[in-house]
């Protein structure tokens, strides 16, 4: 239970990451906001906590907004969603879904491509992980991660690892 957001993931409905929300939360006229959520930023922050807990159970303690120097000709600090100096790990978390009509969320794929670019620019020696929500398209059952890897493989730097979190089983899906 995350009391600050009044979300209970043990009672989450299948394929609904937000879980139970407070009765005082009302749905505003925001067509691109996740149903039942206070805001999309809350959904992302909650998903980061899920990732932190997953890695902590495996002995990797991560910090939020982990800053690393990245760049091509010059270096500038970039904050990854999660990271650690010992062991050297950086993680980007994405809780994106297929659109309601089972179409590709193309703007979200651009954000994934941006994450790949930052992984490419990150210092050598860091383990690079994209931690994503497992979401299957209703039409053919393809997961969003499988689609991304099939379509954008040319953007994925060597060595990037993918973890696909199934919110129903609360486990990583084998890709």
Language model region names:
Residues 78-95:
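Active-site beta-strand-loop-beta-strand hairpin of nuclease catalytic cores
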Residues 38-42, 46-49, 127, 148-175:
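Charged, structured surface patches that assemble and position nucleic-acid processing machinery
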Residues 93-151:
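Catalytic cores of nucleic-acid endonucleases
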Residues 76-78, 149:
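Alpha-helical scaffolding within the catalytic cores
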Residues 69-75, 137-140:
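Acidic-and-aromatic substrate-binding clefts and catalytic sites of carbohydrate-active enzymes
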Residues 30-69:
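Acidic-basic catalytic patches of nuclease active cores, encompassing PD-(D/E)XK
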Residues 3, 64, 78-80:
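Short beta-strand or tight-loop elements
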Residues 1-25:
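A detector of short terminal or domain-flanking linear segments
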